[in-house]
Amino acid sequence: MSSSSAAALGSDDGCSPAELRPSRYESQKRRDWQTFTQYLAAHRPPLELRRCSGAHVLEFLRYLDRFGKTRVHEPPCPSYGGRSPSAAGPVAAAAAACQCPLRQAWGSLDALVGRLRAAYDERHGRAGEPDAVAGAGAVATDSTSSSSAAAANPFAARAVRLYLRDVRDAQAMARGISYHKKKKRRGGNMNGARGGGGGGARAGVNDGDATAPPVAVTPGLPLPPLPPCLNGVPFEYCDFGSVLGGAHGAHGGHGGGGGGFYGAGVYLPFLYNTFS
């Protein structure tokens, strides 16, 4: 079909030629699938796609290493681990004459496996299966078919994932980098550690008040008389509680909850050391 006829066909359908052209991802996925099918046809003995497993995918990935362009240094090499030797000296000459093998980069292999997995699902996954029987068992049939299709996909095998992880770790060690992320510390624990050193007795009182259940005290009850030995002793206000009334409650004053009979914040200045 000529370009003019293709343009005319696109105009009749209401779609421009740019919209009919497949995306770069789709084109690359189609080329990768053709390469894999050619590899299966050239395999000795010839291998059918329905008999393909994760082990055959690993053979295909190792076969692609022949055409790799990423030099992966090995432990005897001076450049192993990301070390850059100086410009002069025998170490630099040995690094220049490095004979480490060329491999496929981990990122290229990971993207290739992802495209082939998607291509397999399009051709032999749920798209190629007959429709499930409508009715009450339709949902169960769909879930069963999707799980069986995922299990039958050789590019989604666990061995392939482990191989990609090993390739990533080996190339990371050769380059002297790490893909492991550091664990972030929680901000709440750090703030608590910073504020835990100070506070003293006041912090202890506030913590006790926050966890203590409220005490229901009937309002309007008359206060009991003070002991005879405390007659004439002046009372003052204190933020840290009451010697007679106990800890500082949520509501201060006479009859307040959690403040005792004589209210929160009342103490005896002359007898403070005696009672404490």
From Swiss-Prot:
Residues covered by the ALOG domain: 24-183
Domain of life: Eukaryota
Gene null: resulting phenotype: Enlarged sterile lemma in florets of the spikelet, caused by homeotic transformation of the sterile lemma into a lemma. Elongated empty glumes, which mimic the lemmas and have the epidermal morphology of lemmas with four or five vascular bundles.
One GO MF term: DNA binding
Protein name: Protein G1
GO CC aspect terms: nucleus
Residue window of motif Nuclear localization signal: 181-185
Protein's GO biological process: floral organ formation; mRNA transcription; post-embryonic plant morphogenesis; regulation of flower development; response to light stimulus
Biased composition (Basic residues): 178-187
Localization of this protein: Nucleus
PROSITE patterns the record matches: ALOG
Stored InterPro entries: ALOG, ALOG_dom
Start-end of Gly residues biased regions: 189-202
Coiled coil: none
